[in-house]
C-alpha cells in the first residue's frame, strides 16, 4: 500500500477483497468502480472484465498469467502486467531440493520414523547417486537456466528442451539441447519449468510418460495444467515413474482429502510455495504495485512486464 500511495497519491482508495468462488458475485460488484486490480490466481475472463468498465490494468503478483483472458483484456483496453522476475533463484533452489529429497527417499524415511517409529535404512530401495544421473529440463527460460547452473556440480549431465529460445543459449549455459523424445528417453530426472500456453496443456500425459525409458523422477514446477493427473497417477501406480514432486496441481484449491497423490511415500507436494522466501515476497509485492503505478501514470515503458498491446 505504501508503494501505491506514494505513486498515486494519498487519496488512492485501496480495498483488499478475500476472494473465493462463493464470493464471485460480490467480487464483480467491487470491480465495477476499480481502476486497477492486483491478483495472483483469480480467473479474469471476459465476464469478469464486463463487470469492470473502469478497469485499466490487471497486475499479476506472479510470473504466470494464464488466469487472465488476454484477448478479452486487450479488446477492452486493459493492460495485463505479471511480475517476470522475482523468484528465479527460489524456484530453481526448490528444484534442487526436490531432486535430492526424492532421490534419497526422504519422504519414505520421514514417514517411517514419525509414524512407525522405525529405524531401518534398508527398508527403502537402493538409489543411484545424483552424480550418476542425467537431468532433463523442459522449459529453458530464466528459471530453467538457473536450475541448470545449480545442478552442474550434482549430476552427470544436463539436457534441455525449449523450442522458443535461441539455440545458442543451451551451450552458453553448459547444457546439451535435446529433442523432446531424446530428453524423455535419456533422463533419470525430469524437471518441468514451462509456462502454460495453448501448446502445452496436458503436455505430460500417458504418451509422454510411456517414452520415459529410465522410469525417472518427475518434478513439476511449472503449471499444474501441464500435467494430466490421471495419467500421472497411472504412471506412478505402474512404476513408470520412480517418484514425483510438485509445487503445483491441477487446481489451486485442490481437494487434498481425496486426492490420490496424497499419502504416497514417493510423492512430495508443496502448496505452490517454491517461490517463497523473505526476499521474493518483498520483491513480489513491490514490483506488482509499481506496475500499477507506472501504468496508471501513463509510464508504460517503466512497467516491468506488459504482456499485451494496449
Residue ranges, per PLM feature:
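N-terminal glycine-/charge-rich "phosphate-binding" loop or analogous flexible N-terminal tail
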Residues: 1-34, 159, 168
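NAD(P)-binding Rossmann-fold cofactor-contacting core
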Residues: 153-171
Amino acid at each position: 500500500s505504501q508503494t501505491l500511495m506514494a505513486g498515486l497519491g494519498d487519496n488512492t482508495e485501496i480495498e483488499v477483497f478475500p476472494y473465493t468462488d462463493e464470493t464471485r458475485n460480490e467480487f464483480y460488484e467491487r470491480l465495477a468502480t476499480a481502476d486497477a486490480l492486483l491478483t495472483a490466481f483469480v480467473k479474469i475472463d471476459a465476464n469478469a472484465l464486463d463487470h469492470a468498465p473502469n478497469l485499466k490494468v490487471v497486475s499479476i503478483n506472479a510470473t504466470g498469467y494464464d488466469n487472465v483472458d488476454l484477448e478479452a483484456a486487450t479488446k477492452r483496453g486493459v493492460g495485463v502486467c505479471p511480475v517476470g522476475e522475482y523468484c528465479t533463484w527460489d524456484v530453481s533452489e526448490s528444484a534442487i531440493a526436490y531432486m535430492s529429497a526424492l532421490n534419497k527417499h526422504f519422504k519414505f524415511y520421514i514417514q517411517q520414523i514419525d509414524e512407525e517409529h522405525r529405524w531401518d535404512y534398508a527398508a527403502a530401495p537402493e538409489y543411484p547417486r545424483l552424480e550418476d544421473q542425467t537431468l532433463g529440463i523442459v522449459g529453458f527460460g530464466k528459471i530453467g537456466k538457473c536450475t541448470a547452473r545449480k545442478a552442474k556440480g550434482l549430476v552427470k549431465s544436463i539436457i534441455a528442451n525449449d523450442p522458443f529460445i535461441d539455440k545458442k543459449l543451451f551451450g552458453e549455459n553448459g547444457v546439451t539441447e535435446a529433442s523432446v523424445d531424446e530428453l524423455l528417453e535419456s533422463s533419470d530426472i525430469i524437471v518441468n519449468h514451462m509456462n502454460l500456453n495453448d501448446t502445452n496443456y496436458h503436455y505430460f500425459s500417458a504418451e509422454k510418460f510411456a517414452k520415459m525409458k529410465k522410469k525417472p523422477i518427475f518434478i513439476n514446477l511449472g503449471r499444474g495444467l501441464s500435467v494430466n493427473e490421471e495419467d500421472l497417477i497411472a504412471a506412478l501406480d505402474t512404476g513408470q515413474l520412480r517418484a514425483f514432486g510438485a509445487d503445483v496441481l491441477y487446481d489451486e484449491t485442490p481437494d487434498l482429502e481425496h486426492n490420490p497423490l496424497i499419502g504416497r511415500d514417493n510423492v512430495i507436494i508443496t502448496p505452490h510455495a517454491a517461490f517463497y522466501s523473505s526476499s521474493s515476497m518483498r520483491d513480489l509485492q513491490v514490483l506488482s504495485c509499481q506496475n500499477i503505478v507506472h501504468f496508471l501514470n501513463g509510464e508504460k515503458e517503466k512497467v516491468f512486464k506488459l504482456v499485451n498491446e494496449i
